[in-house]
Amino acid sequence: MGDGERREDENPTTSAADDDDDEDYDEPGGGNHFLGFMFGNVDDSGDLDADYLDEDAKEHLFALADKLGPSLKDIDLIKPSAAPTDPSEQDYDAKAEDAVDYEDIDEEYDGPEVEAATEEDHLLSKKDYFSSNAVYASVNSKVSVFDEENYDEDEEPPNDNDLPSDNIVQNCTSASAEQLDMAPSNDNLAVEKMSSSLSEPEESFESEAFQKEMVAEEQLESKTATSLPVLCIEDGSVILKFSEIFGAQEPVRKAKMDRHKRPVNKELQITNFTDIVEEDEEVFLRSTIQNLSALKHIKTNDNFVESDSDESTSDVALRLKDSCLSEQPMKDKDIPTAVQSPVFPDFYPLEHENWENDIVWGNSPTTAIQPCLTSCAISKESLDDHNEDQAEGYVSGCWDVQNKFHSSSVMADPFGHTEIPDSTSYRSPENSYSPLRKETAQENNSLDEPNNITQPVKIDTTRHLNKLSLLNKELLEGSWLDNIVWDPSEDVPKPKLIFDLKDDHMLFEILDEKNGDHLRSHARAMIVTRPMKTSAVENVDHNNQAIALSGRFNISNDKFYSNRKMSQQARSHAKKRATMGLKLVHSVPAQKLQTMKPKLSIKEIANFHRPKAKWYPHENKLTARFQGDECSHGPMTAIVMTLGGKGVKFLVNAEETPLSVKSKASKKLEFKPSEKIKLFCSGKELQDDISLAMQNVRPNSILHVVRTEIHLWPKAQRLPGENKPLRPPGAFRKKSDLSVKDGHVFLMEYCEERPLLLANAGMAARLCTYYQKTSPSDQTATSLRSNSDGLGTMLAIDPADKSPFLGNIRSGSHQSCLETNMYRAPVFPHKVATTDYLLVRSPKGMLSLRRIDKLYAVGQQEPHMEVFSPGTKNMQNYILNRILVYVYREFRAREKPGIIPQIRADELPIQPPITEAIVRKRLKHCADLRKGPKGHLFYIQRPDFRIPSEEELRRLLTPENVCCYESMQAGQYRLKHLGIEKLTQPVGLASAMNQLPDEAIELAAAAHIERELQITSWNLTSNFVACTNQDKENIERLEITGVGDPSGRGLGFSYVRVTPKAPVSNSTHKKKSAAAKGTTVTGTDADLRRLSMDAARELLLKFGVPEEQIDKLTRWHRIAMVRKLSSEQAASGVTMDEIPVSKFARGQRMSFLQLQQQTKEKCQEIWDRQIQSLSAMDGNENGSDTEANSDLDSFAGDLENLLDAEEFDDEDVGNTDIRSDKMDGMRGLKMRRCHTQSQINEEIQDDVAEAALVEKLLEESDSDMKRKKQPVETTNYSTPMYNQGNKMKQGKAGQMIKSSVYAGALTPKESIPREAKEVENFAEGSLPSKLRTKTGFDANDDIILVKRKNIPGKDGFKEKRQGARGDTLVCGACGQLGHMRTNKLCPKYGEDPETSEMDVNSIRSHPPDIVSNAQIKTSNKRLVAKVSSEAFETEGPESIEKAKPVPVKFKCGAPEKSLDRNMSISASLVSDKRMMDATDSKSTGKVNKIKISNKIKYDDYPPDTPKPSVVIRPPAEVEKDLPRKKIIIKQPKVLGDQQRPTELRSGQEPRKTRKIVELSSFEKRDREDDNGFSGQPIQINSSHDRGWGLVGKRSKGIMESSESWRAFEEQRERQEQRLIEARIYDARREDELQKAKKKNKKKKKHEFRDDDLLDPRPYKNDRRVPERGRAAKRRTPADMTEYTPPAKRHRGGEVELSNILEKIVDHLRTMSCSFLFRKPVTKKEAPDYFDIIERPMDLGTIRDKVRKMEYKNREDFRHDVAQIALNAHTYNLNRHPHIPPLADELLELCDYLLEESADVLDDAEYAIED
């Protein structure tokens, strides 16, 4: 069954339709149907109903007279001599005499094609575009920067034979005509058909040689007709035709019965060729496809042009050079040779084409190759026309018609590049030919020389013959056999695309790639802006420019016809769009978000509107953790970093000088070696002639490069070349292009302090000017457009159109503005001072200077977009989309063959409130979370996941969304800066304010909070967009004037929304009480109708109305004026005794139109003032700043007093940073007093960012150079590492037993850097969030790491293991592992979280006037431990990072509680077991630089510097069953144990009374107990007994018998006794020191040193809000008064006295003697306490009274402190004799502090009395 028969069976419906078409062929007038279809006024006989055709139509019809039948011959269309009969001779380039050229018509049309052409032209005057030093050939050249811009200018290849820029329709028509005339057929029937249908051309294309070849071929075919079919004769051998022998042999049938039936998609049919009658369909199909294409084109081209079909259908005919097959839809391809693929994918036209004739045989006779050459020459001519059209930039037809057999997407490239889609089922004949090679082209070009053909047609023919003389490599190699389709159901594979650089028909884009130079040197045709295979998203980039691009190719000038047919509604929408402007196209880096950071630092957010740069290096202590030991020789790593943030790592020698380092860095940092630069290390400049080692440059140090030379850019105003695009998407394709090194620079200065929206680098903006016409015929805008200087795009506004701004532009004037996709803002030009230049610094530190072209002042923004509101779904979706886009782009960038892309989880820009769990769930569809070999988590791309295209990514996240989110972050930071953290919307604040008491301070604070929330960026933008989305119809819903005015002086608009029904205050109610009366007026003396003419006259005279004006008014006009004036004065609260204002006042209700008109008038007034203010060249802009800010300053003072006096017992600290704690401690308007705190935090952020960059650079190095060290993590406790002590070898040297806690605890307090805690926190960055400790110096951290347990009778220690649950639970109160804060077994269960604050304060508080040395017991045992303070000071930060597993099993006895200020090294050395074996000391190697000494040097231990000793016990005293290779590191007894009083043995005393006795110790032992609780607790009445019971219970689990337990109890009691004795001694010693101090007559101001209070005083930070499940955080001890500006007080001395007394109370609370008196005594601790004590008092109550400012003098304060001492003597004198001395000590210390502060207290008390 043949192919045609098979299709008949499959498509019976289509076959029937074709049979009907066959019947149409028999009709005599069949051609008239087509003519009637075209015009509709031609009858069946071919006569015209009315002769209304114009000359062009008659001319085209006359050209078709031979095809359309004899009926048209009788019509007098045109004179025969007027036009040639052959279409090929028609001069399509010549214009008719009456032709009107609409291409350059200047009509008033504000469409985008006009705007795009004029935007860049009017930014500057022509003289500004050229530099004085620039050389241009001719300013008046045809291609100028002032002409219409064209994105395709850079696409024109350097081809001298470019076609003239003509109409595409003319090109298509002429090309088709040439094809038709030059297409001889191989078959006689086809030749007859062509000759009968077309008129004879005057100039024949065929030469005499061609005719001879055709005759020879006909003779050869006639000879072999009766035998086998012969293709050609080569070397005497006959080559037969493959298709005739092996093809399907079918008898010759008539054309009517032998037509191949094909399915037709009725929906996509365009043309039905009913009048093409062929005698032999098979012969017709065997003819070249070019002939068929030309035949169809000449039949249908004019039809489509002249028809009334829609625009898209007409565009099909205009764009396609060759039409589709009969009754077939158009395909998704645009093959250059106009070959259209058949419908079916299994339809292969091999059997319907003489493909053998196209084979080029090297030695074949001339007669065999001539037909093929002729046919292919025609095809090549069409190809030339197509490629020349491409060179001109014409868009070829590539239509997105979906193929029903294949679903591959087709992308339409607007720059004319054709891409064969995957669904192509036909291989173009040209693709099978080998491209032209250089050597072949030279050989063939020599053929032209001897012939010397002068005719252009012959030259072209020879050129095509030369191109076709190549051999088919696929045919020679036999590879074409692999492409034969044997199975009809199998799709034809996609043809190969051969790139040949020597082929001038192939255009190559020169990208910035490595092979770019190679392409430039070898390609015959270039340069194309767009890539050959562009992505779908890059096509979307041109959608915004599609209208502008179509203006060049829109020959029909549709805009002039579409405007006339446009409806009124469409016209209004067009005006709105013209007013609002076009959507701008950003640069490629901005669209890819390359210019925007995923996460902004605090410094960037704080300075969001005024970014700050780093211009001078300073010491970064956070990077000290990466530095190595000092080395005097050998190689080391140095990181050279610029101030712009560019860092490069180098390998240098310690003996090298900075000069050699400069030479190494000169290449990578792009500066000349001779350039003068400076190197800084740790904030100090390095000398060039001294080695790095001599200048203390350590390994991994940062060397900052400061470049001092300034480069001048005198020619920076130059524009790019004329053939390059000036705006996106063609321009600014790389980040490096976004520079000010060339082009023009306009500086825009915003008048708003905090603009609502700010664009990032690379985002588009447009400068345009609106001109308000005086009349519809005003042409001033045209003159301004041609003579504009810095006006940008000129847009005219008709008098009936609305203004694009809130205010109206005056008639006849113009206003410039800056437009982006986010906002519109008016701009006002200013003159640039001659002394002003722009200083530019590159990321590599180069300084450059250039001129400034224009300077503008930007007015108030009118937003088009809403800023995200915090906590909303839109904000969360944005963060998730940002993470998704980041992951997708990273996956795409890391795609490599055989490698699955993966991303580290910690690299994702996760920001709150998004958590890792949400991110993991969101990325579940594209990536799997897996753990790497080193424990890092990675997101690995799923194998079945397809990365979205760039277009989808850009739609998912736009640059405008990033700007909105950054603006939200800046607004949130400002609220936090003001102390508003939880509120983001002012909803409900008005009703809440009504419930507040009638106090001015509280109402002012609430009003301030409400005002700050109203003027946030998200509220203002939301209000404006909501009120203006209907073309500013609801602008009256905005306040226009009020708190939202950014200027504060009436120069800006307030976008705060008016409250519909605001709560009316009492004062407002009183003011309008008169207006509320309505029904009680009638018939009384207040009735306005009863006013006579004279009475109304008298009232108006009293109101101040002129008498002349009154005389002109009638009675009712006078009454109306009386009502108006009375109502105005009553509403304003003005009263006049002589005028009864309230009687005639009436309530006024404005209509909607009146309200709208009033709002417009307000807007116009503000608009005029803004223009006048910002346009003024010289004016005192700050004249009224003092007046405007006076109210705010007064309010700020009142609010400060309120915040000082307000009581908040509990508040969250919220930050683990020392300096961040300082910032959080100063909330609200107190930031005014400590303005330097924000600068400190900005420095911290810079240091952290720099440290992160250093860490990244070091991580990228080899494994030997890595400094990625981590401290001993808390997770190591109770892990198998501690259980492998027997397996570790003792001989390893260089291992150190260190932890971040010890590094901080052992460092002397005087030398602790301010960033010590930051270093620790940075080191703990890898710890889990649950296990990260909040306090670096807290003893609780020591407990987590190490624990000492005492076993009576034994000196050895046993390990304690935890269960699985104990490893995961972390207590929020004490910070220990193994339980929760709600556990009753917790040592801090039921305690006030404030007590934990004292843990830190006590270890830091060592005032020199109170320090006492404990008794030193010098027994016969050796004291061997001595800690070098210098070692810990210098090696502390580094030691944190060098922590490694220790090759021995050890137990460290942590200081279970510090001994506060009395904890000295003298007391710490008290121990009866301090022996060390030399063997053990050698085996352990170097342990934290511990120095061993034979004797004690008392001078080495200053009394205020605690240095815990490290005791290494000899193995002789260790239990025998324990391994010998064990180091037991213990803290001394006095340091580690607690002083607990001996329990009274009288069994009659209640156990609860014992609680107070136990509290007499310096620190509570139960806080420091280890965490892994096991077993059931014993029954204990008090909490501290419970803590001791827990210790006993845990130890009991380790014991083997009850005897051990009893021994343990005895040992504990002995320890308590020793602790009590030491405590009593310390108390006596302190008393002696206090008395000695008092004897000193010279007053010495007490130093509040860093040991006492390291941080600034927390103004509310030490008051916490208890929350369940939140970890207790230590309060920030603070005293920064000497580093901060003096406090500003507005309520006299009460606040000052309160601050001084609060400081004294805080200092008392930090003292060890105050431990028992810090909080009230409860009945649980002492049941009979309140029966004896009538007036309880404690330091907590005193502090509360101080904060409430209840103390008016110091005597009242001291009286309460003395009450504490009196209560202590009354209750504890007989019960606990050691407690009263503590109270006396506290009172003495209070007297001392009061005496030290006597001067400031006198001033404060004097201010209170005044």
Swiss-Prot record:
Stored InterPro entries: Bromodomain (IPR001487), Bromodomain-like_sf (IPR036427), Bromodomain_CS (IPR018359), TAF1 (IPR040240), TAF1_HAT_dom (IPR022591), TAF_II_230-bd (IPR009067), TAFII-230_TBP-bd_sf (IPR036741), Ubiquitin-like_dom (IPR000626)
Domain Bromo: 1688-1797
GO biological process: RNA polymerase II preinitiation complex assembly
Biased composition (Acidic residues): 17-27
Molecular-function GO terms, alphabetical: histone acetyltransferase activity; RNA polymerase II general transcription initiation factor activity; TBP-class protein binding
Coiled coil regions in record: 1240-1260, 1627-1647
Segments forming domain Ubiquitin-like: 636-712
Residue intervals passing through the bilayer: none
Compartmental location: Nucleus
Biased composition annotated in UniProt, kind: Polar residues: 421-434, 442-454, 1272-1287, 1573-1582
Keywords linked to the UniProt accession: Activator, Bromodomain, Chromatin regulator, Coiled coil, Nucleus, Transcription, Transcription regulation
Region feature Disordered, mapped onto this chain: 1-38, 413-454, 1261-1291, 1493-1609, 1632-1692
Basic and acidic residues bias spans: 1-10, 1540-1570, 1647-1670
Alphabetized SMART domains for the sequence: BROMO, UBQ
Predominant cellular place of this UniProt entry's protein: nucleus
Subunit structure as annotated in this protein's UniProt entry: TAF1 is the largest component of transcription factor TFIID that is composed of TBP and a variety of TBP-associated factors.
Family in the record: Belongs to the TAF1 family.
Function: Largest component and core scaffold of the TFIID basal transcription factor complex.
Protein name stated in the entry: Transcription initiation factor TFIID subunit 1
Organism of this sequence: Oryza sativa subsp. japonica (Rice)
Organism placement in taxonomy: Eukaryota, Viridiplantae, Streptophyta, Embryophyta, Tracheophyta
